[in-house]
Amino acid sequence: MDIVGGQNLRQMWDDLAGVYGDKTALIFESCEGIVRQFSYASLNEEINRTANLFYSLGIRKGDRVALHLDNCPEFIFCWFGLAKIGAIMVPINARLLGEESAWILQNSQVSLLVTSVQFYPMYREIRQDNSTPLNHICLIGEQLPADDGVSHFSQLQARQSATLCYTPALSTDDTAEILFTSGTTSRPKGVVITHYNLRFAGYYSAWQIALRDDDVYMTVMPAFHIDCQCTAAMPAFSAGSTFVLLEKYSARAFWDQVRKYQATVTECIPMMIRTLMVQPAAPTDRQHHLREVMFYLNLSEQEKDDFTERFGVRLLTSYGMTETIVGIIGDRPGDKRRWPSIGRVGFSYEAEIRDDQNRPLPAGEIGEICIKGIPGKTIFKEYYMQPEATARALEPEGWLHTGDSGYQDEDGYFYFVDRRCNMIKRGGENVSCVELENIISAHPKIQDIVVVGIKDAIRDEAIKAFIVLNEGETLSEAEFFSFCENNMAKFKVPSFMEIRTDLPRNCSGKIIKKNLK
């Protein structure tokens, strides 16, 4: 079933501007509370001006341009401006340091970068090292340097026409983006995403949450992440909704922002749900218009119940990864939700649980979650310049090996167990880190928890828990281990625990376990 119908991203924005005109498309709020707002027509003009800016800097179809930006309207301008001229966006995680960023520039052969003044010192050093093809930087911000090879984004953009001046032939099969995975266990891989992928993501994710043009979708997810792009921005724009993009997440400000913009849909990762729950209860907790809160894994049943009871919201689960583009397994609009299931497979996909010999498993048995889609359309096209890695993950028939463990029940509901690489081998037993984290997170004194395996000469691996306590709480080792012994099998009880003030996380809120081993 082809729901895209041959429409590329240039056509999408021209059509949206014509259909919705003065309707609000994008609202952005900075950390300082400064709000910028754009209609569909004016946003399309900003995108066109940005496309012309890139053309004036020598960018043509097929060229790659890197973005290293926190959430801002300019990210949206650049993303779709590049797509309109057939160029390719390479977003860089805004939390990466110099060596990691230089590696992405080198491996994607990027010569032009758009970034903000706060990141410029790092990229000035990268240019001086001559270790990458980077030769020009377009800067966003005030008090900009007058260095060679540096241009001012706002000044250049303001001089451009609102009418597109370069319109090469585009196909939905053309690459629109190379999105490098977070690389928490190894060097990141460049996930190649096409125009079709992004258009499909818009329609699919809008269907998943029954999005309409009178909805307001608010997110704090980073724009350089697949979630913000394909689960929030693309569906919001595709449905003609209003997309609210916040610069950063603040637990104290979140509900005020939900009410301020009358958001009807938002999304939360477990860290957000936990930090929202430790905020003081208020009479306004249920005074909002939210009808759906999308969330992603690693939430205990008690946490889910407490959150929905306090704030009067529905949680909609969705499972996916960068390579799947969207949440290919999840709750369906109007469907019964079967906690702790991650839902059922969405339209246009197939899903199976397979064993180590790549054979399908019956209901109830744990194996690898495998997804069948169409490369370059409903799942990613390939890993950029890595054919061997592509072949390992993606079978010729379109079956994608996720590397995640799970099972399905007799009714076709799927259940996530853990990342296969996130299992601890302890004395012959496989122990799921997620299972232990869900159990331990129910302790009333614990705000956050992560479990890792550490080397053990006798039992392969020992289990260590890193915990963050709620403000003002104390927890002894005796109390912690007693709680574990009363709530899990003996072989699953951690051998060590360590109290931290915080846990290392990447841009999407995922804990970076390699930094704890």
Swiss-Prot record:
Physiological role: Catalyzes the transfer of CoA to carnitine, generating the initial carnitinyl-CoA needed for the CaiB reaction cycle. Also has activity toward crotonobetaine and gamma-butyrobetaine.
Enzyme class, first EC level, given as a word: ligase
Catalyses which reaction(s): 4-(trimethylamino)butanoate + ATP + CoA = 4-(trimethylamino)butanoyl-CoA + AMP + diphosphate; crotonobetaine + ATP + CoA = crotonobetainyl-CoA + AMP + diphosphate; (R)-carnitine + ATP + CoA = (R)-carnitinyl-CoA + AMP + diphosphate
Pathway entry: Amine and polyamine metabolism; carnitine metabolism
GO terms assigned for molecular function: carnitine-CoA ligase activity; crotonobetaine-CoA ligase activity; medium-chain fatty acid-CoA ligase activity
UniProt cross-references to PANTHER family, sorted A to Z: ACYL-COA SYNTHETASE, MEDIUM-CHAIN ACYL-COA LIGASE ACSF2, MITOCHONDRIAL
DNA repair among keywords: no
Species whose genome carries this gene: Salmonella enteritidis PT4 (strain P125109)
Database matches in NCBIfam families: PRK08008.1
Assigned protein family: Belongs to the ATP-dependent AMP-binding enzyme family.
GO BP terms, alphabetized: carnitine metabolic process; fatty acid metabolic process
The protein's name: Crotonobetaine/carnitine--CoA ligase
EC number(s) on file: 6.2.1.48
Keywords attached to this entry: Ligase
UniProt-listed HAMAP family: CaiC
